[in-house]
């Protein structure tokens, strides 16, 4: 997996890539580190209702999920990944892009149709209306 800048597996995929059963934050950290050691620069493991965990080789960033009234989880991972990629492409820091992606995905699961994606203004409102705190662990 040399030359991969970002990979965004879910818990199951991270387990397959790393050989580590991912079931909590600590096992996600071990899996992210193992994937990084295979040459991936940035690993972002999506953890469903537990949020996401990123590792860039120097620090881990745990971004909790935003509270949501879940109607349909179909497309939640795609919504998260699209918002993350958009934020990174716009030059946002990984921390900022993760926050935006988490808020975006929380709004996406509140619709009954997986193709209904939230508007930017709704995402910003969600971010501003909730005390959101990421946890950063140094390696």
Can you describe what each PLM-predicted range is?
Residues 1-30:
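Conserved beta-alpha-beta core of the PfkB/ribokinase-like small-molecule kinase fold
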Residues 25-139:
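Conserved phosphate-binding/catalytic region of the ribokinase-like
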């Amino acid at each position: 997996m040399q030359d991969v800048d970002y990979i965004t597996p879910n818990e199951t995929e991270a387990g397959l890539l790393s050989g580590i059963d991912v079931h909590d934050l600590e096992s996600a950290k071990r899996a992210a580190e193992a994937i990084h050691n295979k040459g991936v620069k940035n690993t972002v493991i999506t953890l469903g209702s537990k949020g996401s965990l990123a590792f860039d080789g120097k620090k881990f960033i745990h971004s909790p999920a935003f509270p949501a009234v879940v109607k349909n989880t179909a497309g939640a991972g795609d919504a998260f990944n699209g918002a993350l990629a958009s934020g990174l492409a716009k030059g946002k820091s990984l921390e900022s892009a993760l926050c935006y992606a988490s808020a975006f995905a929380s709004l996406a699961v509140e619709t009954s149709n997986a193709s209904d994606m939230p508007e930017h203004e709704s995402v910003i409102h969600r971010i501003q209306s909730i005390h959101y705190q990421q946890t950063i662990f140094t390696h």
